């Protein structure tokens, strides 16, 4: 975690999101500092994706304060929030099916421009080309740039969505279940790519149910349950937290993750 002199990049205070009488996000506080990698876990329906929807403006908060670098964003629209520096991926592998990887990533880069209307700026000038090329390299897609989206396997579709988000050059990247539906080898491939982003200094909030992925990448872990934050801290503290074990992990999973963390520590 950042030292006390560092100002948060993102602050969330007393954030609520109601759907009718249901509090999908319930009095949620979070500080995100530059360079943070925050992993959010929890059972299905805990409010994880809704929280990202609130931050990114897709589903505005019912109440509460959210600020990026001190600028209030709780009532801003998604495009305005993206222009300020927050980009995200989604659980569904969305893309323009008849367009290439490169063209899809260009759409992402264009959306990130702080300009009135983004379609008029979809020109492949030098700035745009550099953004797209860098994003494709970071996601290991540079050799597949001409492939059409409809022909891509699930892994490459997930990486394409990540590349599109990175092409906006975000200050904060929100990643929603990047390895859902992937096999263990593919999970490792995505983990390596995210580790590269961390080395680049990208600030990340990621949601994931695959706990080995979440624990190995996150500097700080948050667990949600019924819209509330029931844990925030490091990986070791998570495995020793009785409430987290009871409502989410279970004894067997906690023991396996503990063993994994011990082996990782032994092997450096």
Give the residues covered by each predicted segment.
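The feature captures the beta-strand-to-loop junction immediately N-terminal to the Walker
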Residues: 41-43
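Helix-to-loop junction immediately C-terminal to a conserved catalytic motif
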Residues: 56
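Conserved ABC ATPase "signature" region
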Residues: 118-150, 192-195
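ABC ATPase C-loop
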Residues: 165-166
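Conserved catalytic motifs of ABC-family nucleotide-binding domains
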Residues: 169
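Catalytic Walker B motif of ABC-type/P-loop ATPase nucleotide-binding domains
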Residues: 173-177
């Amino acid at each position: 975690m950042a030292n006390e002199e560092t100002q948060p990049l993102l602050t969330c205070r007393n954030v609520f999101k109601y759907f009718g009488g249901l509090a999908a996000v319930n009095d949620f506080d979070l500080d995100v500092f530059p360079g943070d990698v925050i992993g959010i876990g929890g059972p299905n329906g805990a409010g994880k994706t809704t929280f990202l929807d609130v931050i990114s403006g897709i589903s505005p908060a019912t109440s509460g304060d959210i600020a990026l670098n001190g600028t209030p964003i709780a009532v801003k629209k998604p495009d305005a929030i993206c222009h300020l520096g927050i980009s995200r991926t989604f659980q569904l592998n969305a893309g323009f099916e008849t367009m290439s990887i490169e063209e899809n990533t260009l759409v992402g880069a264009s959306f990130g421009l702080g300009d009135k209307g983004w379609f008029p700026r979809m020109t492949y000038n030098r700035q745009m080309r550099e953004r797209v090329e860098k994003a494709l390299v970071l996601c290991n897609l540079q050799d597949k740039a001409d492939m059409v989206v409809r022909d891509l396997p699930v892994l490459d579709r997930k990486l394409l969505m990540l590349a599109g988000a990175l092409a906006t050059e975000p200050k904060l990247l929100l990643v929603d279940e990047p390895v859902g539906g992937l096999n263990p080898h593919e999970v490792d491939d995505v983990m390596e790519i995210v580790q590269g982003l961390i080395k680049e200094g990208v600030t990340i909030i990621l949601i994931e149910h695959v706990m080995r992925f979440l624990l190995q990448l996150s500097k700080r872990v948050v667990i949600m349950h019924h819209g509330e934050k029931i844990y925030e801290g490091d990986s070791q503290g998570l495995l020793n937290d009785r409430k987290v074990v009871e409502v989410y992990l279970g004894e067997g999973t906690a023991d396996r993750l503990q063993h994994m963390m011990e082996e990782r520590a032994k092997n450096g």
